[in-house]
């Protein structure tokens, strides 16, 4: 992939043994599953959202406002920090594109999906807003993310070939997801 991502990785040595990346769009359940995987493996959990929120706070913007601005420098700062964390310690990272950012530095790449209605319900509950408002925010954000990632990184969010595990959790609870991922972890890392 010819993009800035390669520049982020050049001349970097991986000092970690296990890095798990969990990708998905807004409301897909990345953070929730990442906490479970972190618990299973006993690893630190990092969320690219935390870096994003801290940048929004520094600029006195809501995360929705910053997402609308979505300056290239913000995306690159988040991705650089994500990569630095993954290279320096065993961890679980969740973001929309962490598997793309880390590429082969990720030892297990998971993609979560859920239909728009379920994602809107989750975001509405988390943000304490109406489901309709959440849906509009998600649709706008998904469209913007897809365009940005294509422009900045040549990433096609529809391309799922890089993932080791795809989970549609529209109708799956967290315990069911945990079981699926635990089996994949046991197979990949001989971890029980």
Model-derived regions: residue spans:
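Extreme N-terminal, non-catalytic leader segments
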Residues: 1-17
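ATP-binding Walker
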Residues: 28
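Walker A/P-loop
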Residues: 31
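ATP-dependent small-molecule kinase phosphotransfer cores
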Residues: 40, 44-102, 116-118, 125-136, ...
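Small-molecule kinase domains that catalyze NTP-dependent phosphoryl transfer to phosphate-bearing small molecules
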Residues: 131-180
């Amino acid at each position: 992939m010819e993009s800035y991502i390669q520049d982020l990785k050049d001349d970097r040595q991986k000092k970690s043994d296990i890095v798990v990346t969990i990708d998905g769009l807004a409301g897909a359940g990345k953070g929730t599953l990442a906490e479970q995987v972190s618990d299973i493996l006993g690893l630190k959990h990092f969320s690219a959202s935390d870096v994003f929120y801290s940048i929004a706070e520094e600029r006195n913007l809501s995360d929705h406002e910053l997402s609308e601005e979505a300056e290239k420098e913000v995306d690159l700062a988040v991705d650089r920090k994500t990569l630095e964390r993954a290279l320096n310690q065993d961890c679980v990272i969740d973001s929309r594109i962490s598997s793309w950012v880390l590429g082969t530095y990720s030892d297990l790449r998971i993609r979560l999906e859920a239909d728009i209605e379920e994602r809107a319900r989750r975001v509405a509950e988390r943000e304490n807003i109406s489901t309709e408002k959440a849906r509009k925010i998600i649709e706008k954000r998904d469209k913007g993310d897809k365009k940005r990632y294509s422009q900045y990184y040549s990433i096609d969010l529809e391309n799922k070939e890089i993932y080791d595990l795809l989970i549609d959790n529209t109708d799956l609870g967290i315990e069911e997801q945990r079981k699926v991922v635990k089996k994949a972890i046991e197979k990949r890392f001989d971890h029980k």
